[in-house]
């Protein structure tokens, strides 16, 4: 725990005074860069929370595939449970947890689909086997057996022995545009540091508040 609390940020701040940060995306970039060097698996993994039509929450782990000042991007099947829930209620919460650094970041905001061009560009970077799997999978639908899935994969693979695999029309991405960030850092005796950034719209400035642990 003492090692984690002595980390230096590129900005010159230490983990103990990260609360001096004034812009959440820059702070996230610093923390994510450090997590990318310390997390043993998937530093871009994030919990994605959505709400179903009955108001019941659903949460699952997904991989962040990009971020910038406009938000955080992930991809999946449009007809999946998450896709259907986001279509009905385009709001979500994210959680990044980096155990190696004793840190987490929470995000909440509105969700919008990425453009076809953006989805096409990302899909083209996936391995061919992953591209084929996206065509074969009917994500979140009942599956008779693993063998049936493997047969579907083989059928798609046979159609794409040569050449590029196009993006399935039912597979795309979403962008979560933050209205709220919360940065949490572990401290001894549970006297943790927490700061929150809020804004009413993407055009408004951020308001920062320090929170009790």
From Swiss-Prot:
Q: Tell me which residues bind substrate.
A: 65, 122, 126, 130, 190-192
Q: Which GO terms describe its biological process?
A: pyridoxine biosynthetic process
Q: Which reaction does it catalyse?
A: pyridoxamine 5'-phosphate + O2 + H2O = pyridoxal 5'-phosphate + H2O2 + NH4(+); pyridoxine 5'-phosphate + O2 = pyridoxal 5'-phosphate + H2O2
Recite the UniProt cofactor note for this protein. Answer: Binds 1 FMN per subunit.
Disulfides per UniProt: none
Return the broad EC class.
Answer: oxidoreductase
PROSITE patterns given for it? PYRIDOX_OXIDASE
Q: In which pathway does it act?
A: Cofactor metabolism; pyridoxal 5'-phosphate salvage; pyridoxal 5'-phosphate from pyridoxamine 5'-phosphate: step 1/1; Cofactor metabolism; pyridoxal 5'-phosphate salvage; pyridoxal 5'-phosphate from pyridoxine 5'-phosphate: step 1/1
Q: What does this protein do?
A: Catalyzes the oxidation of either pyridoxine 5'-phosphate (PNP) or pyridoxamine 5'-phosphate (PMP) into pyridoxal 5'-phosphate (PLP).
Say which family it is in: Belongs to the pyridoxamine 5'-phosphate oxidase family.
> What does the subunit comment say?
Homodimer.
Output this protein's name.
Pyridoxine/pyridoxamine 5'-phosphate oxidase
State the organism named in the record.
Rhodopseudomonas palustris (strain BisB18)
Task: Please state the gene responsible for encoding this protein.
Answer: pdxH
């Amino acid at each position: 725990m003492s090692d984690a609390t002595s980390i230096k940020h590129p900005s010159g701040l230490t983990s103990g005074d990260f609360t001096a940060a004034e812009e959440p995306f820059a702070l996230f970039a610093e923390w994510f860069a450090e997590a990318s060097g310390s997390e043993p698996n998937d530093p871009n993994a994030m919990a994605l929370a959505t709400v179903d039509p009955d108001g019941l929450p659903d949460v699952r782990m997904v991989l962040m595939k990009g971020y910038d000042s406009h938000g955080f991007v992930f991809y999946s099947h449009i007809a999946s449970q998450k896709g259907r829930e986001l279509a009905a209620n385009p709001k979500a919460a994210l959680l990044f947890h980096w155990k190696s650094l004793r840190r987490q970041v929470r995000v909440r905001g509105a969700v919008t689909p990425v453009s076809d061009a953006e989805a096409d560009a990302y899909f083209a970077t996936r391995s061919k086997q992953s591209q084929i799997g996206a065509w074969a999978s009917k994500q979140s639908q009942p599956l008779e057996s693993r063998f049936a899935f493997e047969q579907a994969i083989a059928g798609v693979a046979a159609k794409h022995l040569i050449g590029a695999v196009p993006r399935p029309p039912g597979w795309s991405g979403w962008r979560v545009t933050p209205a709220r960030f919360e940065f949490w850092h572990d401290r001894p005796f549970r006297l943790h540091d927490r700061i929150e950034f809020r804004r009413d719209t993407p055009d408004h400035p951020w308001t920062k508040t320090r929170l009790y642990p």
